[in-house]
A protein has these predicted regions:
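A conserved short beta-strand
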Residues: 141-147
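Proline/glycine-enriched tight loop/beta-turn segments at coil->beta junctions
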Residues: 25-26, 35-43, 118
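Alpha/beta-hydrolase active-site loop
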Residues: 92-112
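Active-site glycine-rich loops that stabilize anionic/oxyanionic intermediates
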Residues: 47-52
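Short glycine-enriched nucleophile-adjacent loop
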Residues: 129-140
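Alpha/beta-hydrolase fold nucleophile elbow
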Residues: 114-126
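Conserved alpha/beta-hydrolase
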Residues: 61-87
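An N-terminal hydrophobic leader/cap segment in hydrolases
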Residues: 1-21, 28-36, 122
Length: 147
């Protein structure tokens, strides 16, 4: 699934979009951008709130890149461009809150750590905060996160 732009909310240049397999094979959409500056300050990993999506953060992504940060954003399972667990795609559902924890660990191990420069910072809104601050995501990032 491509990112969606509007005239007032364009996609920041240089995006790399992909999917990783979450727990149970659920496709999880992510996007990442390199820093717009040669002087790099690390990577900001954005973890949206409930019912949010990558596109909501385009303005934030642009500002962070202009300040020398790479950015990686994850769409939660059941939200944004990620896979759904219900037939009705308008309903968000997760079998266990621990699935979010597993998704963050996979996102860090497969997307952020291999392809984005350290140190790693978490920028989380609402539901994103408890999901990225639980023990497994922090352990997946190791001593390289969260600053």
């Amino acid at each position: 699934m491509d990112l969606v732009a509007t005239p007032k909310n364009p996609i920041p240049l240089g995006v790399s979009i992909g999917f990783l397999k979450g727990k149970g094979g659920v496709p999880l959409r992510y996007a990442r951008w390199r820093s717009a500056l040669k002087e790099r300050h690390g990577t900001v990993c954005i973890f949206p709130g409930r019912s949010e999506f990558i596109e909501k953060y385009f303005e934030v992504v642009g500002e962070l890149r202009r300040r020398g940060f790479a950015v990686a954003v994850l769409d939660w399972r059941g939200q944004g461009g990620s896979g759904r667990l219900m037939r009705n795609s308008l309903k968000g559902h997760v079998k266990s809150f621990n699935d979010y924890e597993d998704d963050v660990a996979r996102f860090m191990n497969e997307v952020a750590l291999p392809d984005c420069p350290p140190p790693y910072y978490a920028l989380a809104h609402s539901m994103g905060a408890p999901c990225c601050s639980r023990p497994r995501p922090c352990a997946a990032a190791g001593s390289r996160a969260w600053c």
